[in-house]
């Protein structure tokens, strides 16, 4: 499955992001995340915000050798800046684990966006030592808000997942990446919903130098993720 497709696309390494969509599934999700982790696959675990043992599970995520934590506020039904998340974020920050958030709009919850860029900015302010990866350029279909609230924050990486199908203004794509700082941009796809074949042409049309494209497509990610291995 995944490794076969990576071979087809000529991709050496990838990141798999797992989501605990319910309390009772949390431990099994992280067991699976640990089972698929390999030299080629970095693997993020997850905790459910309503799990009574969420803090203990974060310790287990680290003990399992997982590479970070993934939240999807729409699937897990919480606002990213909810006060109940503070102990969880404090624990993640103390463990030094990077955390990825689905950010912005999602078709599962089209009328209620749980991770608006302004909400994510509050989290970044409250936990300045927590390394955050804002998926979908920090806010799917919320690109103007990304420019207003998120650009240039040193504890934030922006990934490019699922950008090509939604971002119509390619000049804004370049403006966001350069405005944030190319050392904190990570190429991503959101496979299987999008693929490198769909996302790479957008990056290639953006006018970056070969060295800049290398930083975005793999060097930044390697520097970030190898700190945990």
Stretches found by the model and what they are:
Residues 6, 33, 61, 69, ...:
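Conserved, mostly hydrophobic/aromatic
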Residues 17, 72, 188:
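Conserved residues at the C-terminal ends of beta-strands
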């Amino acid at each position: 499955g995944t490794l076969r497709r990576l071979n087809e696309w000529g991709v050496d390494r990838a990141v798999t992001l797992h989501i605990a969509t319910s309390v009772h599934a949390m431990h099994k999700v992280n067991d699976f995340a640990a089972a698929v982790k390999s030299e080629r696959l970095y693997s993020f675990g997850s905790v459910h915000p309503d799990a009574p043992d969420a803090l203990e599970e974060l310790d287990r995520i680290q003990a399992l050798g997982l590479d970070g934590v993934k939240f999807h506020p729409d699937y897990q039904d919480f606002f990213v800046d909810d006060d109940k998340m503070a102990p969880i974020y404090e624990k993640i920050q103390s463990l030094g684990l990077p955390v990825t958030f689905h950010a912005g709009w999602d078709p599962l919850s089209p009328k209620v966006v749980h991770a608006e860029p302004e909400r994510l900015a509050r989290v970044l302010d409250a936990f300045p030592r927590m390394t955050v990866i804002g998926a979908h350029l920090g806010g799917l279909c919320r690109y103007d808000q990304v420019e207003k609230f998120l650009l240039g924050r040193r504890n934030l990486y922006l990934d490019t997942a699922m950008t090509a199908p939604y971002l119509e203004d390619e000049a804004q794509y370049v403006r966001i990446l350069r405005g944030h700082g190319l050392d904190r941009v990570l190429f991503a796809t959101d496979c299987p919903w999008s693929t490198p074949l769909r996302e790479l042409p957008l990056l290639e049309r953006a006018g970056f130098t070969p060295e800049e494209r290398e930083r975005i497509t793999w060097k930044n990610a390697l520097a970030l993720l190898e700190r945990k291995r």
